[in-house]
């Protein structure tokens, strides 16, 4: 999936996460995480984000994650909404998701 434009998903409310994405000129993934629960769950947050990006074959992006204690399912949903917005498609290609 190609990221064409910057996008934002989520809020800064307690129990939620705000994620910003922007395309990069390289194939790197620049991931910055700021979380109120980073000491306990930072590795799990990073793993979830990288798993979702790999599932949709996303490369060459900068991600800024401001987590306020979001559950894994919320993080997953926010990421999928963000990818749809940033790629300019109305819905994710569920049938292509492996």
From Swiss-Prot:
Keywords: Cytoplasm, Phosphoprotein. It is found in: Cytoplasm. Its main location: cytoplasm. GO terms for cellular component: cytoplasm. InterPro entries: CitD (IPR006495), Mal_deCO2ase/Cit_lyase_ACP (IPR023439). Pfam families: ACP (PF06857). It comes from the Bacteria. The modification O-(phosphoribosyl dephospho-coenzyme A)serine is found at residue 14. The keyword Chaperone does not apply. Oligomer with a subunit composition of (alpha,beta,gamma)6. Belongs to the CitD family. Covalent carrier of the coenzyme of citrate lyase. This is Citrate lyase acyl carrier protein. It comes from Shigella flexneri.
